[in-house]
Amino acid sequence: MTSFDRHPSVTALRSQTRQPRPGTLPTEELRRLCLEAGADDVGFVPIDRPDIASERAGVLQVFPAAKVLISVVCRMNREPVRSPARSIANLEFHHSGDRVNEVARDIVRQLEDRGIRAMNAPMGFPMEASEFPGKIWVVSHKPVAVAAGLGQMGLHRNVIHPRYGSFILLGTIFVDVDIDQDSQPVDYNPCVNCKLCVAACPVGAIKPEGGFDASACVTHNYREFLHGFTDWVEHVADSHDAKDYRRRVTDQESVSMWQSLSFGANYKAAYCLAVCPAGEDVLAPFIDDRPAFLAGIVKPLQQKQETIYVVPGSDADEYVTRVFPHKTKQHVNSLRPTTITGFLDTMHVVFQAGQAKGIDAVYHLIFTGKEPAEATITIRQQTLHVQRGLIGKPDCTIKADSQTWLGFLRKERSISWALLTGRIRVRGGLSRLQAFGRCFLG
């Protein structure tokens, strides 16, 4: 007998009578386990379901054994989220987020005790920061929740639960066991199409016809996260002395950043959640007295005097001036790609539909050097279409050294220098290049 065979742990395990690991769990048993762990609602989706195909690769990369995704819902308290005092709202966001993670972790522990492998993804942060500004999340909770029958996406790009409305946070658990019955999406959208989220959004990110300006949302609401934080750090680095720093950053902003670093990053708005009346448990006050609902919940957020963070020349920049002139604008930097792939993948995020008005053009982008790539960009009727490869006849061709192009986007290289040295070449007229540039933040 080898030393391994004589090891106390090995001999103890081999002497046990172990229960066989279940190959399939009854869905109702799994549901009961999740609800008893503290979830307010739960649904189950096999990983091979077509409606979560976009999530499959990411999940299997971190947990190759995954067979089923469990989507859990935890409610938030409504009145704190509605408060114009966003410290109160953020306290609710933070504690509710922690609750989701606690519930998901408890479910994983109980499954593990039954011999079932499981893994829970974070409700929000931490994420895979090394992938920034690309896809830094392991799984998108929202499409999983929709597939699991926990609601539908509202105009504001949040999942609306049929009962609890927008006042929920989501978690996802990966398990390596099959179930006997998966969940199905709800057959209607709880969104009541009131468009109060459109009216309340301070940067005009939510469009009444259904569009969404993700860059405007991220730039303001996530000011103290992600690239908003790096923008602040660069103000610190660029300041010559304390007086110069105070010229760049107000004392209130410095304290706000300290607060986020000390107690968890705070959202600047999330007004779209605050004003949403959808959901069976939420809807009555809106139906019973709409003017009172508007006066008590929507108007205080619209009338609040606050700093709004926008990229100069963006659609949000113009929107704040036009719709909320009593709010104070502050110009900040946009997302900065670090790779050509990242640039192409995030073009739809930074595209400015308002700035694209009147442009009807097809662009061929040819990148050479360290990161060669080709793409066809169509801007037409204030919409953007990105295709890999060179397709059709272009109105303008831009050929650029990849590192020079990225340096230009990151404001580390001059476009004039790049054109003079031939590192960026344009066929079709510089006016086309200028029109192209107007459509994207930076």
Residue ranges and their predicted role:
Residues 2-102:
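Non-catalytic, usually N-terminal nucleic-acid engagement modules in DNA/RNA processing proteins
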Residues 73-75, 176-178, 368:
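Structured loops at beta-to-helix junctions and adjacent beta-edge loops in soluble globular domains
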Residues 79, 181-184, 385-388:
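Short small-residue beta-strand/loop micro-motif enriched in glycine and branched aliphatics
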Residues 296-442:
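Feature captures hydrophobic
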